[in-house]
UniProtKB/Swiss-Prot annotation:
Co-factor requirement: Zn(2+)
Binding site for Zn(2+) 2: D82, H83, D163, H198
Lineage, opening ranks: Eukaryota, Metazoa, Chordata, Craniata, Vertebrata
Record note on cofactor: Binds 2 Zn(2+) ions per subunit.
Protein name: Endoribonuclease LACTB2
Role description: Endoribonuclease; cleaves preferentially 3' to purine-pyrimidine dinucleotide motifs in single-stranded RNA. The cleavage product contains a free 3' -OH group. Has no activity with double-stranded RNA or DNA. Required for normal mitochondrial function and cell viability.
Underlying gene: lactb2
Family that this chain belongs to: Belongs to the metallo-beta-lactamase superfamily. Glyoxalase II family.
Length: 287
């Protein structure tokens, strides 16, 4: 998949500026999208990129100067290092001596989290965060992680989707059941636009969310079909990756296996397939 080229700094609307995390890679695409939100002299920063990326800190400083603004507070969409990792550098290089909060949803089950000598201010589903020109509503959307947050930007009928939905490709997840529920929740928002955690802005928001839901259902059917066509045989998860993800580049097979394993666990819970140890874990159809 060839990726769109994204500038390191871009004003996306009158109240949203994207600052690219300068950390491109197979899992981060063009890099983590971080966003300055609002229209005033103090704005909200959503996500912070990875640790020790001086190019990102330089881009963020440039954005603050260009738009004559400062950071009111930080919101991180989830605990992954490519979203929280820049907090220490921002605290030291941009916010030194400033009093500001770093907001996120708590881990589930709860665990104490400390980053860069800061304690998080924990939010809850439905909380409202405001700054001049922007109103954000917290949406608890677990699945990618247990603490995942999306944010509704009321003024634009838009969603900051974190890693629940990407601008290109599909997302990985920890819990497929929760992830599907979160996609349904976002679909019900009837948003017009998505500002994703990675990749370009999505303008056909509802179509994209429906595409994600349909994609996961289709993957499930492919797994069941592969097992049913070989009834009596058992397969390792990587065997199934090579069948189901045959059009996916091999360097992404480990990530694909991660997703496929969650499909297998869901299908096992539903009694459609069974797991056997011989000596590695293998799967067969019950249908």
């Amino acid at each position: 998949m060839s990726l769109s080229v994204l500038p390191r700094l871009e004003q996306l609307s009158s109240r949203v500026v994207r600052v690219l995390g300068c950390n491109p890679g197979p899992m981060t695409l063009q890099g983590t999208n971080t966003y300055l939100v609002g229209t005033g002299s103090r704005r909200i920063l959503i996500d912070t990129g990875e640790p020790a990326v001086p190019e990102y800190i330089s881009c963020l400083k440039q954005a603050l100067i260009e738009f004559n603004t400062s950071i009111q507070e930080i919101i991180v969409t989830h605990w992954h290092v490519d979203h929280v990792g820049g907090i220490a550098d921002i605290s030291r290089d941009i916010m030194k001596g400033c009093n500001f909060s770093i907001n996120k949803l708590p881990r589930n089950p709860h665990q104490e989290e400390v980053i860069a000598d800061h304690k998080y201010n924990y939010l809850k589903d439905g909380d409202i965060i405001t700054t001049e020109g922007a109103t954000l509503r917290v949406l608890y959307t677990p699945g990618h992680t247990d603490d995942h947050m999306a944010l509704e930007l009321l003024e634009e009928n838009a969603i900051f989707s974190g890693d629940c939905i990407l601008g290109e490709g599909t997302a990985v997840f920890e819990d497929l059941y929760d992830y599907m529920k979160s996609l349904e929740k976002l679909l019900e928002m009837k948003a017009d636009k998505i500002y994703p955690g990675h990749g370009p802005v999505v303008l056909g928001a509802r179509a994209k969310i429906q595409e994600y839901i349909s994609h996961r259902h289709a993957r499930e059917q492919q797994i069941l079909q592969a097992l049913q066509e070989n009834r009596g045989k058992s397969f390792t998860s990587m065997d199934l990756v090579k069948i189901v993800y045959k059009d996916t580049p091999e360097y992404l097979h480990k990530a694909a296996e991660f997703n496929l394993t969650h499909h297998l666990q869901k299908l096992k819970k539903e009694g459609k397939i069974s797991e056997e140890q011989s000596p590695t874990v293998r799967w067969r159809s019950n249908l």
